[in-house]
A protein has these predicted regions:
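Basic, polyanion-binding surface patches
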Residues: 2-185
Length: 185
């Protein structure tokens, strides 16, 4: 990890084994925040998931990245389905509670008032008040440092009056002002 010059603010390198360098790279990314809900083996869980995104329009597919040591990981494998609830900017507290605690230690549903409603096509409850709720069926997995769960949407609902919660540099944000698109010549 080196800076290209004293006057240059860039940090560059290929030492991805260096935790601080990886953290610096990660903190330059911008993501939304989703709450993953799952029911399996007679239990339910909710997990904050920063790495959640749409990956296909037709068919409508999403992916989430979940570390293998998370309790949610094995539940997702067993269930083969999950709820993907993209947080509104009013739900940072729900993200914080579900992202700061593990089902290995505590029942997160008891730590906060997670407003839920019954799903239409899956077993897991859905989180009320989200900007987008997607009921998903897993169609594949790919193991990296985390496991990518690739899923097809089987039901969705969204609220166009709400604004998404944004995560950057370890902090929550509201969506800001629109940057005008430049004119194409």
């Amino acid at each position: 990890m080196t800076s290209t010059s004293d006057a240059d603010p860039f940090v560059e390198g290929d030492d991805f084994g260096d935790r601080e360098f990886r953290r610096g790279v990660w903190r330059q990314t911008l993501t939304n925040v989703a709450l993953v809900t799952v029911s399996a083996g007679g239990r339910q869980n909710v997990m904050a998931c920063e790495w959640a995104m749409m990956v296909s329009h037709a068919p409508l597919c999403f992916t989430i990245a979940v570390h293998q040591r998370n309790a949610t990981h094995d539940m997702l494998l067993e269930a083969g389905e999950f709820g993907l609830n993209f947080c509104s900017d009013e739900q940072a507290h729900l993200s914080h509670v579900s992202g700061s605690n593990s089902l290995h230690d505590v029942d997160k549903w008891q730590l906060a008032d997670f407003p839920t409603y019954p799903a239409t096509r899956i077993e897991a409850p859905m989180i009320e008040g989200s900007v987008l709720n997607v009921e998903c069926r897993t169609v594949g997995t790919h193991r990296l440092g985390h496991t990518l769960f690739i899923a097809e949407a089987v039901w969705a609902r969204y609220d166009p009056t709400k604004s998404p919660l944004v995560f950057h540099g370890g902090k929550y944000f509201h969506v800001g002002e629109q940057v005008p698109k430049p004119q194409v010549l």
